[in-house]
């Protein structure tokens, strides 16, 4: 047997063991979820316990310290495990997890580069434990296992990670009676900043975005600030092989926030931020090489009566090899709520403009980098990121019946500059601007139905269709793309 064959057999054996481990865990979690759902005390728990957060380290079950453990529901037994039952209010462990299955069907994916129908099954398993040592010290850890079957020609790196550490950090908090509240987190962590368009956690794909580094947060009165510096975790398909020291992509930033209480306005927030981004290998239409980019931005959001707004604008500078970066992007979203109606409908009008490169022969590049924006920037087909696009969008959503939420979104897309091409998430150059002078990219339609069975189970159906415009039709692959996603998620 050759060394190559031996390694191949070893890899298959490890993969088999890991798959068996994950399947066992998945069935255990599903069974646990079903048991919790069937528990006769669930109605009480649903009414008195907090919802699960998108970032699970934000879940806080310290309030259970003031109740008798003998009165706990089966679910609460997992959420508060005191290390010393003789000392209520002392150190405790809280555990939880998630199982997510999603079937994705695509027709003529990537503008027809992959013709016909293609289906894939994705599975994601997350397990976490939160060790709370005191009011000021804790350690949070989370494992991830992500699998995909059926994707052709191959799975994306953000959809497969057989078993690895998603998060593992230590947190030091300020004293409970301190005037300024804050914390310092050091380790692998997910980062989300107050609704920013340029920093999301990549929830759509199987593997969420995480960073190796440090984050400091301070809040006092109407002001808060965040300072962070980290390298971006690059997911790999194997076992515990996501590097802790890979600095090929780094990200640092400072965000200053102000959230005053103003008469006639609710949920008002204003942010000023600066981000520093480095990528050792990136490709744009004009040039490929090492990128060092700074982003300076302002954001404002809030609500007045039935009206709601969320506006953000950014300037970018820096270098891409020998080229100077000069780019900008703005996004405006204005919503109107009909809260008195039984279905509580909401209508949102959006307009975003993101620059592309204006001149291939000069010493500048004007393509805006959307950094870590949502992968489904223009719908669930995830065909494009915002770079070099002008987007007019209309979104309507409502609760048809209790727990069933439906939304319909339309995006009309043009190129900002005819001298630049198009980019797929996260920033992959997919189409040259040379194929046509047309700005017309096309229309994207998305229908989303979300059924919240209870606090543990969510079922979602997403249908999307991209209708190709003149620029797409002029290319080597020139069709629209349709997609259907069926997603079931269990959390505990």
Give the residues covered by each predicted segment.
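N-terminal periplasmic/intermembrane-space "pro-region" immediately following the signal or transit peptide
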Residues: 2-4, 22-28, 36-117, 128, ...
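Extracellular/periplasmic loop regions
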Residues: 49-72, 285-286, 312-313, 323-435
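Outer-membrane beta-barrel "beta-signal"
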Residues: 61-63, 479-492
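Outer-membrane beta-barrel strand-turn architecture
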Residues: 87-89, 131-135, 174-178, 208, ...
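Residues on the lipid-exposed face of transmembrane beta-strands in outer-membrane beta-barrel proteins
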Residues: 97, 123-131, 167-172, 214-218, ...
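Structural signature of outer-membrane beta-barrel domains
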Residues: 102-106, 136-138, 142, 146-148, ...
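Surface-exposed loop and membrane-interface regions of Gram-negative outer-membrane beta-barrel proteins
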Residues: 105-123, 131-181, 197-201, 238, ...
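Signature for the C-terminal beta-barrel architecture of outer-membrane proteins
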Residues: 178-184, 197-361, 419, 435-436, ...
């Amino acid at each position: 047997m050759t060394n190559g064959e031996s390694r191949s057999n070893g890899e298959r054996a490890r993969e088999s063991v890991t798959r068996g481990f994950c399947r066992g865990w998945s069935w255990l979690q599903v069974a646990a979820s079903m048991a919790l759902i069937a528990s006769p005390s669930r109605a009480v728990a649903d009414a008195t316990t907090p919802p699960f957060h998108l970032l699970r380290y934000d879940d806080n079950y310290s309030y259970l310290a003031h109740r008798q453990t003998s009165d706990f529901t089966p679910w609460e037994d997992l959420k508060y495990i005191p290390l010393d039952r003789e000392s209520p209010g002392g150190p405790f462990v809280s555990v939880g997890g998630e199982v997510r299955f999603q079937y994705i069907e695509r027709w003529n994916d990537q503008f027809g580069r992959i013709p016909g129908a293609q289906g894939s099954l994705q599975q994601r398993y997350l397990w976490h434990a939160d060790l709370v040592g005191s009011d000021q010290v804790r350690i949070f850890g989370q494992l991830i296992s992500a699998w995909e079957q059926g994707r052709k020609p191959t799975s994306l790196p953000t959809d497969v990670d057989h078993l690895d550490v998603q998060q593992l950090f230590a947190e030091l908090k300020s004293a409970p009676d301190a005037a300024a509240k804050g914390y310092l987190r050091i380790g692998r962590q997910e980062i989300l900043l107050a609704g920013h368009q340029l920093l999301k956690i990549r929830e759509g794909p199987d593997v969420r975005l995480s960073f190796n580094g440090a984050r400091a947060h301070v809040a006092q009165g109407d002001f808060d600030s965040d300072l962070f510096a980290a390298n971006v975790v690059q997911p790999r398909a194997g076992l515990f092989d996501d590097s802790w020291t890979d600095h090929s992509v780094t990200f640092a930033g400072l965000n200053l926030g102000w959230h005053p209480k103003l008469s006639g306005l609710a949920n008002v927030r204003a942010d000023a931020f600066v981000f520093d981004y480095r990528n050792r290998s990136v490709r744009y239409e004009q040039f490929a090489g090492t990128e060092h980019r700074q982003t300076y931005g302002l954001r404002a959001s809030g609500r007045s009566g039935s009206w709601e707004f969320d506006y953000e604008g950014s300037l970018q500078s820096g270098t891409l090899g020998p080229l100077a970066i000069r780019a900008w992007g703005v996004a405006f979203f204005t919503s109107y709520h009909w809260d008195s109606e039984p279905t509580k409908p909401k209508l949102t009008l959006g307009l975003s403009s993101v620059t592309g490169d204006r001149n291939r022969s000069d010493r500048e590049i004007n393509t805006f980098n959307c950094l870590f924006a949502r992968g489904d920037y223009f719908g669930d087909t995830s065909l494009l990121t915002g770079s070099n696009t002008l987007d007019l969008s209309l979104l309507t959503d409502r609760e048809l019946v209790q727990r069933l939420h439906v939304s319909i979104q339309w995006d009309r897309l043009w190129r900002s500059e005819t001298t630049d091409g198009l980019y797929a998430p996260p920033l992959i150059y997919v189409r040259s601007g040379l194929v046509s002078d047309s700005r017309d990219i096309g229309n994207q339609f998305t229908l989303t139905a979300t059924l919240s069975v209870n606090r543990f189970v969510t079922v979602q159906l997403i249908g999307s269709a991209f209708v190709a415009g003149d620029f797409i039709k002029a290319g080597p692959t020139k069709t629209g793309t349709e997609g259907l996603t069926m997603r079931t998620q269990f959390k505990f």
